[in-house]
């Protein structure tokens, strides 16, 4: 009925080309340690970016990544911000997240950042790499993280204007339905051991 109404009331070109959107470019990260320097004489601080290649992600890893990110490096209460800025004053800003692929069968990767004074750059990098190599374990933070993630699902519901586009994207990504249902189940059942396992397998 909708299709008939659209054809009747809108003038559409019958020779429309099929869209290839969205275009997702394959990550091309180095398979060995590589350092790039960009010298800007006007820069007032060091901007440090950290990229670590990952591998194809299973659905369970994708779901767990959000909890890992909240624990490790997403937000002011995460390890990276607390250890780098709050406890050691080595950076103005700092974060680190495991970036999931747009498609379910894609490759993930770790993406980190620090903005710091030039004279603190080396110490900041050493501290950041220390967190990556030996993640501190603070399981008591889990309840607060889980509660916050469950609350975030309430505000992530698409509104009526974007519902059709969002549902289409879910299908294109490879989901059978609303992924928030999967995330809800994951948040309710996840424990700190899952976060540690994710860290050990992906970093």
Q: Where are each of the predicted segments found?
A:
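Active/ligand-binding-proximal structured segments within catalytic/core domains
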Residues: 46, 50, 59-73, 79-82
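M16 family metallopeptidases and their MPP-like homologs
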Residues: 1, 45-56, 81-192
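Short amphipathic C-terminal alpha-helix that caps PH/PH-like domains
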Residues: 6-10, 68, 124-132
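A generic secondary-structure signal for well-formed alpha-helical elements
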Residues: 9-17, 75, 88, 132-136
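Short beta-strand/turn micro-motifs at beta-sheet edges
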Residues: 35-39, 96-102, 197-198
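An aromatic/glycine/proline-enriched structural segment found at the starts
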Residues: 1-56
């Amino acid at each position: 009925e909708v299709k008939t109404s659209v054809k009747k009331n809108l003038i559409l070109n019958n020779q429309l080309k099929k869209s290839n959107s969205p275009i997702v470019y394959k990550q091309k990260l180095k398979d060995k340690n590589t350092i790039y320097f960009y010298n800007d004489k006007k820069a007032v601080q060091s901007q440090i970016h950290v990229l670590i290649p990952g591998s194809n992600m299973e659905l369970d890893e994708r779901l767990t990544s959000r909890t890992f990110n909240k624990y490790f490096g997403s937000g002011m209460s995460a390890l990276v911000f607390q250890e780098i800025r709050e406890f050691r004053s080595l950076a103005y800003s700092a974060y680190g997240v495991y970036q999931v692929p747009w498609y379910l069968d894609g490759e993930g990767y770790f993406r980190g950042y620090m903005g710091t004074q030039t004279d603190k750059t080396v110490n900041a990098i050493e501290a950041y790499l220390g967190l990556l190599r030996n993640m501190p374990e603070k399981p008591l933070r889990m309840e607060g993280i889980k509660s916050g993630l469950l609350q975030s699902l309430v505000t992530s519901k698409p509104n009526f204007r974007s519902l059709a586009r969002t549902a289409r994207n879910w299908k294109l990504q490879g989901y059978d339905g609303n992924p928030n249902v999967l995330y809800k189940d994951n948040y309710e059942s996840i424990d700190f051991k899952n976060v540690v396992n994710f860290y050990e397998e992906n970093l």
